[in-house]
């Protein structure tokens, strides 16, 4: 039956939860429960999650994003819950989350292709999407767009110290691990769930041809925020800074060094050692990058100030949220306790 409330369970590492909560707040027939890792997101991010009323509530879990994701995934396979409640997800484990995201890959790549001859005087360049990545849902949306015909030649997976996918691309060994806290906290994912989708869509050899991968530690993130501002005047957040630095390095010598035979140490921040099929287009200066920026820098004011020497301006809508009371609910990293809470609080 499709009668009754649809309960959305969503794990967030910082940004997904507030977007989902805002989209579904006060929507009749929908109920939203957001799980986020306590103490591992910025103050503004937490305020965006913990101040909802009505049909949206936030559980702050004593654990990591991977723990939050595990609780949500386990709930979806729990027969007791499935019999009593209509459950769905707004995470990328739900394909309905990925399909709309694929549209902006399609749109942006078509706009660039149609404008490039006017703006850059390049002749049919390769279009590369540079994607700050944690759980790899966003990048997987780009892969879907490419398979639907978007004129994208390749992707750069830009990650922080949680470099499970870059290490896989470098070695062929997929080794999920506990996540590590970084300045780019929305990407603090040690076991990306979309690895399974990527592996289902492409062979490992195809992945190495399609992807470059680039990672930074915290010091590199701060330097990149400052470098981006110095070179472009743009104030960028920690996640976008990794994407910006990845493209800046790739098109200014790093890819050319790989093509010429230099071996990269993938244990050090930077580019993984595989050479994608579009590498020569980089060397020949016949490639254009589309860098995805994922968050407002004001959500990471202390980090940006430390990097640039000044705080980013906080938009009024974020400043207003900071004045609202915290309504988050503490939750242990224990599935039985989480299940008990759901059974007691969800409405049929």
Where are these regions (language model features)?
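PLP-dependent amino-acid enzyme catalytic core
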Residues: 1-261, 270, 276-348
């Amino acid at each position: 039956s499709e009668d009754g409330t649809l309960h959305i369970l969503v794990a967030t590492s910082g940004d997904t939860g507030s977007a989902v909560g805002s989209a579904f707040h006060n929507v009749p027939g929908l109920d939203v429960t957001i799980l986020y890792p306590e103490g591992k997101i910025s103050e503004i991010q937490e305020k965006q999650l913990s101040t909802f009323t009505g049909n949206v509530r936030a559980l702050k879990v004593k654990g990591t994003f991977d723990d939050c994701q595990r609780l949500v995934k386990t709930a979806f396979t729990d027969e007791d819950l499935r019999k009593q409640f209509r459950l769905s997800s707004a995470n990328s484990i739900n394909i309905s989350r990925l399909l709309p995201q694929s549209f902006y890959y399609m749109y942006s790549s078509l706009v660039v292709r149609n404008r490039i001859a006017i703006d850059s005087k390049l002749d049919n360049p390769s279009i590369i999407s540079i994607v700050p990545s944690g759980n790899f849902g966003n990048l997987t949306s780009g892969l879907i767009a490419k398979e639907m015909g978007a004129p994208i030649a390749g992707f750069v997976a830009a990650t922080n110290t949680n470099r499970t996918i870059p290490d896989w691309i470098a070695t062929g060994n997929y080794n999920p691990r506990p996540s590590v806290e970084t300045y780019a906290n929305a990407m603090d994912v040690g076991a990306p769930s979309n690895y399974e989708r990527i592996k289902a869509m492409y062979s490992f050899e195809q992945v190495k041809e399609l992807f470059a991968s680039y990672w930074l530690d915290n010091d590199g993130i701060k330097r990149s925020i400052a470098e981006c501002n110095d070179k472009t005047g743009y104030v960028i957040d920690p996640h976008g800074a990794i994407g910006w630095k990845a493209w800046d390095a790739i098109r200014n010598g790093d890819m050319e060094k790989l093509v010429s035979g230099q071996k990269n140490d993938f244990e050090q921040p930077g580019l993984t050692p595989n050479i994608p099929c579009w590498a020569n287009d980089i060397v020949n200066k016949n490639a254009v990058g589309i860098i995805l920026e994922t968050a407002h820098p004001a959500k990471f004011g202390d980090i940006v100030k430390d990097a640039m020497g000044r705080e980013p301006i906080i938009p009024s809508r974020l400043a207003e949220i900071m004045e609202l009371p915290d309504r988050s609910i503490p939750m242990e990293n224990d599935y039985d306790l989480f299940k008990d809470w759901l059974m007691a609080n969800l409405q049929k």
